Amino acid sequence: MKQQANLIRAGQVIEHDGRRWTVLKQQIITPGKGGAFIQVEMRDLKTGNKTNERWRTADTVERLMTEEKDYTYSYTDGDNLVLMDPETFEQALIPAEILGDAVAFLQDNMQVTVDLVEGDPVAIHLPAQVTLEIVEADPVVKGQTASSSYKPAKLSNGVRVMVPPFIEAGERIVVRTEDSTYVERAK
């Protein structure tokens, strides 16, 4: 389906130069002189190579339609994630590199959504938030109450996050999977 370049959004899959690309970032740039253009950072679905492309906002690009399918995460097998279809119980091997750094947030039996283009996986979406345990947290520095102070902490999955001073090791917190930020104490 053809669409104007200025309607491209992160997460969409497009076809350009005979190859499929997933859009990582997009930014509309309006210079002081001349017409606006869109700067797009995208990754080749076959090779994983990243590139930047510029189009005028009036240019058209071929957007590929994606189909969403729900899966349950089972386990990691080398460089692949083993996901199970909850309806048919069939297993699917999907490259872990599609998920990127967010692979650290995968938990057993977690429900994930996979975007497919003509049967090929192009993106994996995790739940917006996950609950994890703090395994180590730096002590609070006294007298830092004038500004909103946060301290570094390490989660059970190895990811480091900034948490409020009242959070201690052994507590469970809710973390946003999109940007690895603290949300609240787990209830």
Curated annotation (Swiss-Prot):
It is found in: Cytoplasm. GO terms for cellular component: cytoplasm. The keyword tRNA-binding does not apply. InterPro entries: Elong-fact-P_C, NA-bd_OB-fold, Rib_uL2_dom2, Transl_elong_fac_P/YeiP, Transl_elong_KOW-like, Transl_elong_P/YeiP_cen, Transl_elong_P/YeiP_CS, Transl_elongation_fac_P. The lineage of its organism: Bacteria, Pseudomonadati, Pseudomonadota, Alphaproteobacteria, Acetobacterales. It holds the Pfam family EFP. Keywords: Cytoplasm, Elongation factor, Protein biosynthesis. The gene is efp. SMART domains: EFP, Elong-fact-P_C. This is Elongation factor P.
